[in-house]
Each structure stands twice: as C-alpha cells, then as structure tokens.
Amino acid sequence: MKYNPTWSFVTYWTLLGKGEIDMPDGFPPFDNTVDWCGPEDDAAFSAMVPDFILEAYVGHAGYRHDHGYATPAALRPAWCRRQYLWRLLCDYRFRADLKHIIKREIKSAARRKQAKIWVRLYYWSVRCGGWRHCAR
C-alpha cells in the first residue's frame, strides 16, 4: 500500500514490519547503526545531535522522515501530490513521532521536560539541515 504521513508511529512500524508499504526504489531497510538524525551537510551541527534523546532512541523517527522525503509522487496518496505540502507533512509527522517516542520511552516527567527541549533542537536541525538528514 502507499505510504501515508498521517499514520501513527505504531501503525507505520507495524506495516513496515509486515512489509506492506510500497518502498521507493533503492530505499534501504532500517539499520540501527546508521539511522540517526543530524544534517549530513553540516558535520559540526550533526555532532551536537545525539542518537538518543536522554534514554529514548530516536533514529526510527528519522528513518520514517527520510522514507517520506524519498517517496516519489507515484507512491503518494492521491490527496497529496504537491512536493512542498508533502515535505511539510513529513516534517510535522517527524515531530509527532519524536514526541511519541519520548513519551513512550521516558517515564520521569522531569526527564520528559528536558527531552522536549532536545526535540525542538532536533526537529529544527532537520527542517534547516538540508534535503536528507540521516547518515546514509
């Protein structure tokens, strides 16, 4: 089936695990060792962005974001073909996925509050960091 950026984080990973999502040609499978977020065209800034936000591994959100960016118009749902709107949806979904991961993985309210500051930095590193942010 076609990828839809409105799917929840859990739905996306469930369908991906079952192999039910049409993937772009040549798009690599998820690899825990390389899928982390940080703009690859700015090494100094990338070094500031961690693989983990406190205890939460967030490469899953980065992988999904890259999947959305790499999805050609033919594999997108009919309701969204415009490139700008599609990228905006992917970016918003990335932020929502980050928040979901933080909420699920970090149990302490004080630690979650700290993590939200990192989420903001992380999100803007992706928005401002170029076309692709994962180290592929």
Predicted regions, residues:
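Extended terminal accessory/targeting regions
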Residues: M1-R136
